C-alpha cells in the first residue's frame, strides 16, 4: 500500500489509516478512523469507498461479538440441560458482558446513522445503503434483547427495512447489489426475528426472480456482487423450504425460536 501524499487532508489521512487498520485486522481502530472521517465531512456525503470502509469496520467489530454470543448461548443451553446451575450462573454473567458490548457498538453506529449519514444521503443508493444498515443494527439488537426491548428493536428494524425497500423498489434496478442485499437481510429478519418463514421465502424468491429476469442488463462492474447475493438468496430459500417441509404448518406457527443465526446467509 502506497504512503499517503504529504499534502493529504485529515479526511484522506483517516481513510488511509482505516485501510491500514483493515489490513492489520484491527477493526476497533478502523471504526474509530471511519468515525473521524464521518465527522470530517460534516454535512457532506461519504464517498462510496468511505461508506464501504465504515460498513466493513462495523461489520467485523459486531460480527466477532455476535459469533461469541452464539457460542456462549449454545454452551449455556447445554449446561442448563445438564443441570449445572453454578456453571449456568457464570455463563449468564459472561453472556451479559458480551451483550453490553453488542449494545454499545449498535448504539454507536445507529447514532451516527441517525445524526449524520441518513440525513446527508442525497441519492437512492446511498439512502438504501444507510437505511439497510440501520435495519441491520437494530436487528442485531433484536437477536439478544428480550421482552419490550426486543419488541422495540424488531419494530425499528422493520421500519428501517421498509423505508429502504420503498426507495430501492422505486430507484434501484432489481439487479442492483444494494437492493439485493437489502432483500437478503430483510428476509433473514422475517425468518429469524419475526419467525415468519412464509414472508421470508416470499421476499427472497421475489427478489431472486426479479433479478433473474433482468440479469442480461447487468454491467460487468456489478455482475459478480449481484450474482453472489443472488446465490445467497437461493441458499436461504433452499434451507428454509427444507425446514418448512420438515414441519407441519401448526409447528411452524407455534415455533418458539428460529434456526440458529449462523445457518442463515446475510451480508
Swiss-Prot record:
Cell compartments where the protein resides: Nucleus; Cytoplasm
Single GO cellular component term: cytoplasm
Annotated SMART domains: 14_3_3
Subunit (UniProt): Interacts with FD. Interacts with CINV1.
Cytoplasm is among the record's keywords: yes
Sites bearing Phosphoserine, chain numbering: 73, 196, 248
PROSITE patterns assigned: 1433_1, 1433_2
Region (Disordered): 244-267
Protein name: 14-3-3-like protein GF14 phi
Gene3D superfamilies in the record: 14-3-3 domain
Physiological role: Is associated with a DNA binding complex that binds to the G box, a well-characterized cis-acting DNA regulatory element found in plant genes.
Comp. bias regions, Basic and acidic residues: 250-267
Domain of life of the source: Eukaryota
Keywords: Acetylation, Cytoplasm, Nucleus, Phosphoprotein
Modified residues (N-acetylalanine): 2
InterPro entries given in the database record: 14-3-3, 14-3-3_CS, 14-3-3_dom_sf, 14-3-3_domain
Any Pfam family: 14-3-3
UniProt record similarity statement: Belongs to the 14-3-3 family.
Coiled coil start-end: none
Phosphothreonine: residues bearing it: 217
Amino acid at each position: 500500500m502506497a504512503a499517503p501524499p504529504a499534502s493529504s487532508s485529515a479526511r484522506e489521512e483517516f481513510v488511509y489509516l482505516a485501510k491500514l487498520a483493515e489490513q492489520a485486522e484491527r477493526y476497533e481502530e478502523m471504526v474509530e478512523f471511519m468515525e473521524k472521517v464521518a465527522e470530517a465531512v460534516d454535512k457532506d456525503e461519504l464517498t462510496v469507498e468511505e461508506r464501504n470502509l465504515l460498513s466493513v469496520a462495523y461489520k467485523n467489530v459486531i460480527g466477532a461479538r455476535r459469533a461469541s454470543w452464539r457460542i456462549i448461548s449454545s454452551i449455556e443451553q447445554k449446561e442448563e440441560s445438564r443441570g449445572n446451575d453454578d456453571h449456568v450462573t457464570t455463563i449468564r454473567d459472561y453472556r451479559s458482558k458480551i451483550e453490553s458490548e453488542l449494545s454499545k457498538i449498535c448504539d454507536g453506529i445507529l447514532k451516527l446513522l441517525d445524526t449524520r449519514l441518513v440525513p446527508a444521503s442525497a441519492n437512492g443508493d446511498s439512502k438504501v445503503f444507510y437505511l439497510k444498515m440501520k435495519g441491520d443494527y437494530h436487528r442485531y439488537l433484536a437477536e439478544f434483547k428480550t421482552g419490550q426491548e426486543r419488541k422495540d428493536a424488531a419494530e425499528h428494524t422493520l421500519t428501517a427495512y421498509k423505508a429502504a425497500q420503498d426507495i430501492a423498489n422505486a430507484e434501484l434496478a432489481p439487479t442492483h447489489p444494494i437492493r439485493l442485499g437489502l432483500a437478503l437481510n430483510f428476509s433473514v429478519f422475517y425468518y429469524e426475528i419475526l419467525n415468519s418463514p412464509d414472508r421470508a421465502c416470499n421476499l427472497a424468491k421475489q427478489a431472486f426472480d426479479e433479478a433473474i429476469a433482468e440479469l442480461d442488463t447487468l454491467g460487468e462492474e456489478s455482475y459478480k456482487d449481484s450474482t453472489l447475493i443472488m446465490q445467497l438468496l437461493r441458499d436461504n430459500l433452499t434451507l428454509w423450504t427444507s425446514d418448512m417441509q420438515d414441519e407441519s404448518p401448526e409447528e411452524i406457527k407455534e415455533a418458539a425460536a428460529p434456526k440458529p443465526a449462523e445457518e442463515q446467509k446475510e451480508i
